[in-house]
């Protein structure tokens, strides 16, 4: 294989790898999640409006599990706030504001990936 052919092969492989990484990022958001979590200490959700539950379901689940809402707030009563994100018409998710990584860890231990099926975003402020 000549030097020119090796260079061409390298370019083709590099383009293929770059395309695969871009595709992976657009579907799984690895980099976005890493930046949100590691740099900002936030917990991001990457769902389209169509993928979010109905706003009425979000409100209903929050009412049904009010004791868990209170447990979350009791982690740091003066600094944790829980709201509904209704930026998508008719759809919703939870936003939990917390002051520290330790609080975030405790919230994640209580909730896991969702609040009884409702996606939640965590914001460190």
Pin down the residues of each PLM region.
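Short glycine/threonine-rich beta-strand-turn micro-motifs
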Residues: 45-46, 77-103
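Cytosolic/nucleoplasmic, non-transmembrane interface domains of endomembrane
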Residues: 51-59, 98-99
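Short amphipathic alpha-helices in soluble, non-transmembrane regions
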Residues: 104-114
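Hydrophobic membrane-insertion alpha-helices, especially the h-region
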Residues: 7-28
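Short amphipathic alpha-helix segments
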Residues: 56-79
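Short, Lys/Arg-rich N-terminal segment immediately upstream of the first membrane anchor
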Residues: 1-6
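Ser/Thr/Pro/Gly-rich low-complexity linker/stalk segments immediately outside membranes or between
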Residues: 26-52
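Conserved short beta-strand edge segments in small beta-sheet-based binding/regulatory domains
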Residues: 114-125
């Amino acid at each position: 294989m000549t030097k020119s052919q090796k260079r061409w092969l390298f370019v083709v492989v590099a383009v293929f790898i770059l395309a695969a990484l871009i595709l992976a990022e657009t579907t799984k958001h690895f980099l976005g999640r890493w930046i949100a979590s590691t740099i900002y200490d936030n917990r991001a959700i990457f769902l389209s409006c169509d993928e979010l539950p109905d706003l009425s379901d979000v409100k209903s689940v929050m009412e049904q599990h009010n004791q868990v809402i209170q447990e979350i707030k009791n982690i740091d009563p003066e600094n944790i706030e829980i709201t509904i994100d209704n930026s998508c018409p008719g759809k919703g998710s939870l936003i939990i504001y917390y002051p520290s990584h330790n609080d975030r860890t405790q919230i994640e231990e209580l909730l896991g990936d969702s609040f009884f099926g409702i996606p939640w975003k965590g914001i460190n402020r």
